[in-house]
């Protein structure tokens, strides 16, 4: 499977992922990168078997770096990749066969865009979510690193700034965002702490009234 798919890819591409204790996910994600001629794993000193599993795959480069925020880890991944084209996946994201073939098709075109949005299909506890705004969620996942950079100062919900042409892929990326309610709670606390640090760095203070109004009018 690895060699048969790789042979039809004209463009060299690096698969990128940032990790911390992703032993349950890392193998499936790296298998999604089977058409990439390089895989870069930026690991925040995992204490489980994440790195051990990653090193079993061919063409994998593991870089361990202390976690400060998501933006810095993602930009380090870009800097560590040898190819201009990169495909970024999170530990809880999976490519479908149709999306993989669409990616390969775009890379093989004579005139590609510089960055591509992926729509995502969300799952909660393995069950698909069809509403709550997630149906319109999209993120940049495939792009030329020479044309893009993650915006400095964003500690969570990092933003990719693209200086070039933009396309949108039709097939959706599967996003198994939450496995259970406890992991959801921990994720929200972690994101909340990072967002608080981001706002504090900008000199902003928490306002109960503003937060209430934001929630009420969503």
Which residue ranges define each predicted feature?
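Short, well-formed alpha-helical segments that are part of the catalytic scaffolds
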Residues: 16-35
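Catalytic-site signature of metal-activated, phosphate-bearing donor transferases
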Residues: 72-78, 85, 89, 96-218
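Conserved donor nucleotide-binding strand/loop of the catalytic core
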Residues: 51-80
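Cell-envelope/extracellular polymer assembly enzymes that use nucleotide-activated donors
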Residues: 12-14
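A conserved acidic beta->alpha catalytic loop
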Residues: 32, 43-52, 67, 90
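Short, Lys/Arg-enriched N-terminal segments with co-localized hydrophobic residues
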Residues: 2-10
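Acidic helix N-cap motif at the loop->helix transition within catalytic regions
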Residues: 24-27, 48-56, 98-99
